[in-house]
């Protein structure tokens, strides 16, 4: 029934409803019930979330196992773990991702006072900062926290002499509201289905990094991966977020490359954490661009 109602509402109405996140008390009580958090046993957690937290379906939190993610990325890229760990620490102190984002969202009811990039955001930041890609492609935008993270990493790269850009696809008009205006000059957002929209969005360019956060559907993700592989740069890294991870595993087996699944350990949050799959589907033999 819930999925049927969502379909009837349409993307625009759903986006407007999400803007009332802090006021959706009944919905949030249901979220806690699904995660077995009860008022009588965990009153502080229950009340804090229901009364104050705006997030009802996509959660943000600090991670307790960033070191594990860094180890996965070091194994995938061949780059020193110390270098990747230093890039991971940049996220916590970056002006745009901390105070800048807080200033822009202070009047919004659907955004936390401090947003912490989660597993796939952090993985994307580290790969962009370390690899300095010319082109990143993202399928699935929603409010655009991942887009913001990638664009800020690209901006820092450009300031260091290594420019790049982001191409994103989402079916929802108005997606990406968290992205600051000054970061949009290196961003192209297509309102299109990623399964069919990637070829036109990428054109003759080559993809260095692909982030799939669209639908938890294996056939959908497989179509995205096939489109990206046809336009892959000599070195292509892929991050697949949540849901069915079968598609990336299937491609990995076909290409004979390893696919690693990272499971988040959230700090101080009732959500048990997401799973992301990471792989290097093309490799020209160099660990750095």
Regions found by a protein language model. Name each.
Residues 1-74:
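Membrane-proximal basic amphipathic "stem/tether" segments
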Residues 4, 85, 274-276:
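Short, intrinsically disordered, low-complexity terminal segments
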Residues 4, 8, 50, 72-76, ...:
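Residues that form generic nucleotide/phosphate-binding pockets
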Residues 27, 75-84, 104-111, 180-184, ...:
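Short, mixed-charge, low-aromatic patches
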Residues 34-36, 85-92, 166, 191-194:
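Short acidic/polar alpha-helix capping motifs at helix-coil junctions
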Residues 51-53, 64, 77-116, 129-131:
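Class I SAM-dependent transferase core
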Residues 112-115, 121-289:
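S-adenosylmethionine/decaboxylated-SAM
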């Amino acid at each position: 029934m819930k999925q049927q109602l969502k379909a009837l509402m349409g993307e625009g109405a759903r986006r407007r409803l999400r803007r009332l996140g802090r006021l959706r008390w009944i919905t949030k009580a249901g979220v806690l019930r699904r995660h077995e958090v009860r008022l009588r046993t965990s009153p502080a957690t229950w009340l804090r979330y229901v009364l104050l937290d705006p997030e009802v379906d996509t959660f943000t939190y600090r991670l307790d196992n960033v070191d594990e993610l860094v180890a996965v990325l070091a194994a995938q890229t061949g780059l020193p773990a110390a270098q990747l760990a230093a890039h991971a620490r940049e996220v916590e102190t970056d002006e745009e991702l901390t105070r800048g984002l807080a200033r822009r969202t202070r009047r919004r009811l659907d955004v936390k006072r401090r947003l912490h990039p989660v597993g796939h955001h952090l993985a994307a930041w580290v790969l962009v900062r370390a690899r300095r890609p010319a082109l990143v492609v993202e399928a699935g935008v929603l409010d655009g926290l991942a887009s913001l993270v990638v664009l800020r990493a690209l901006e820092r790269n450009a300031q260091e002499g290594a420019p790049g850009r982001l191409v994103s696809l989402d079916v929802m008009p108005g997606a990406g509201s968290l992205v600051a205006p000054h970061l949009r000059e290196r961003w192209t957002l297509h309102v299109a289905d990623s399964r069919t929209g990637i070829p036109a969005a990428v054109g003759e360019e080559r993809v260095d990094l692909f982030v799939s956060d669209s639908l938890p559907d294996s056939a959908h993700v497989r179509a995205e991966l096939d489109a990206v592989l046809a336009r892959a740069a000599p070195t292509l890294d892929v991050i697949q977020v949540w849901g069915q991870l079968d598609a990336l595993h299937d491609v990995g087996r076909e290409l004979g490359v390893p696919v690693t699944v990272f499971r988040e350990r959230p700090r101080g949050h009732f959500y048990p954490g997401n799973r992301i799959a990471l792989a290097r589907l093309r490799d020209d033999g160099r660990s750095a661009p």
